[in-house]
């Protein structure tokens, strides 16, 4: 018997959420949006209050998780070479602890010393910047350029003096905060170290206990998406920031830029955050321009060349695409993370946005079980059935 021909194109499968939304009329959709928006705001407010109450616990857990996540890659490589998990985790953890301790003992005191010297010399740099503006105004007047800095110089003078006072106060507060941190928050540091080592030993067990709360069909996609998002972002930013700091420190020292170590480390640390490297370069260029505009232009040229080499040459070759997000959404996620969680929110904002993007894409492409077609509601089916002639009976 010939099967009936179906001329209707099969509709693309839809997720149950989209099917439910399409089944609503316009008034119901409006009511859902009107009632859902306040609930989302209340939930966000409640989550913010909970986060504020358990902020210390969340910060310790998140920092330990990120460090353990990054250290897990050399541990996994050592396991593939035949080492046991405990031996590999202990070796990697102790090596990382020694490296961080060495950096903290050598580079951080030098950077803090240069920061104190910079604050002490800023008034002299401010006077030098004013003199350079006066000379620039005189040259513009000689050349006949329609530029007048007479009214601008006093405004810049007062504004920079106010910013200098704020910077000095911020430096003093930072020093006091670091002192209080070393005395009061020592327990948090110890807890972070212990939790990092524990997570490094039992990464798979802890992770399986977390994703075990999800439905079984969501566990592997969620795990792969989260690992890929955080891996690409944190490793990408870490490689870029390290290369940026090393390159800038070397370039600044060759140019004999004052406080080259401090400026290179500052830009490198700021490069851990998207767009932070560019902001750091502009800030350092402005500070050096107060002392010498010619040196500032050389510094800017070297910094831009190193930044382009790192961002467009080294990082893509090592890790490929880092986020896959449009720069606009990267900026929005950073602002949102800063508003919700401060510095901690900025750190996890971009990988969280990447994970949300991947999750939404997975939901849209999800193929639910499509029920069998109901031929009772298809008039073309009966028409095709009438056109089909039955075969004659066998003799």
Swiss-Prot record:
Coiled coil: none annotated. It is a multi-pass membrane protein. One of its GO terms (biological process) is transmembrane transport. This is Putative transport protein sll0063. The keyword Membrane applies. It is found in: Cell membrane. It comes from the Bacteria. Its main location: membrane. The chain crosses the membrane at residues 24-44, 50-70, 91-111, 180-200, 245-265, 269-289, 295-315, 328-348. GO terms for cellular component: plasma membrane. Belongs to the autoinducer-2 exporter (AI-2E) (TC 2.A.86) family. The keyword Membrane applies. InterPro entries: AI-2E-like. Keywords: Cell membrane, Membrane, Transmembrane, Transmembrane helix, Transport.
